[in-house]
Amino acid sequence: CMDRNGNGRIETSQDANGNNLIDRGNPNEFFGQNDECYAWTKAIGRSGGTARALAIDAGDAQNPYGNVWVGMYTHREFYGVQGGDGTLIQRQGLQNPISIGHSPYGAVVDSNGYVWSGTLSGGTIVGFDSSTGRASGVIRPQGVPARSYGFTLDGENRLWVGAQSNGVNRYDPYHDANGNPIQDPLAGGGEWRNSSCGGHRCYMRGAGADAEGRIWFADNTTGMIGYRVDTMQLIGQFSIGGGTTGAGVDFNGFIWGVASGGYTGRIDPNNPNDVRRVTVGSGPYTYSDFTGFGLRNFTAPRGGYKMIIEGCEKLDTDWMTLNAEATLPPQTSIEFRAKVAESRDILSDPGLRAYGPWTMSADGPTEIPADLAG
């Protein structure tokens, strides 16, 4: 978020009256394009392209928070845009947009920078190299149901597909059915596997993998279904009601299901009896990595650490400088941010100004120590 008007606060859409809704007709709650947490808004692609797939990569020197790949369902192509300002990515040898062989409906970027997309109903997968634009052919299901909806990946770069009423499919572009490595993941020939819904009626849609070796699918009939990512063994079903289209993992390990009936449900996978449901408004809909957990754990692993430092108890404290020391492996970096407030309660205010970021990099100059007095 950026303080564009320089008033020392972040002005972003919020629930000002405490009724658990953001009223789009109330200018004190909904800021529209003046929301300072909107980085940019761009029209992507040709008219009628129908954007139905979006994934964020690990970024580059110019866009360290990631670049965005937008898949056009009707025109069967992907546009790569810079995360910083939404302009088209321009690289030597990269033709942008990138033509692919099917209609993308959901996309992910793996840890090696390959962009993968599923499609609606047919079960096919197509990938391409985000650096060069070199694309695979259409990878068709082998020995598994040719059905698809939601699309995600796990920590081993295996691709998962919600196979509608036929459970879930998994495709490994890096290993064949005998476990042998595949040198070129775009060449095809990877292992396909399927796991059923355990005899239950189901309709599998969006999905998200957690950090504990499990993957969670939105079951449109009852709620959520979990599997082990390595064995594809079914863990169980969790009822939050019908109409669930999206499944996501948050950074505290809870599993969230988004239901088109106007609510979201939260599951504690370590306590199956702790299932909560909250009304959120009319027709919420998603089937992708809506929490960013997959991006920050599988595509571009990152972590965070927060620390509160208190000033002198009996005297006023002026915070002047932020300094730090770190041991960094090659090609890694740390970003520092700081907030200053009169009390701990004020620190939690989302509108409080954040200083920074300042970067300490293993491969380049450092911006630490940093000035807090400005």
Sequence positions of predicted segments:
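Acidic, glycine-anchored loop motifs typical of Ca2+
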Residues: 1-34, 181
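A short beta-strand motif characteristic of beta-propeller blades
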Residues: 33-45, 87-98, 134-142, 179-198, ...
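Repeated scaffold domains used in trafficking and secretory/extracellular systems
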Residues: 34-59, 99-110, 144-156, 198-210, ...
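Short loop/turn segments immediately following the C-termini of beta-strands
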Residues: 59, 73-75, 119-122, 156, ...
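Conserved beta-propeller blade signature
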Residues: 63-71, 79, 114-118, 158-162, ...
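Eukaryotic tandem repeat interaction scaffolds
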Residues: 146-237
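Beta-strand-rich ligand- or partner-binding modules
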Residues: 251, 259-261, 266-374
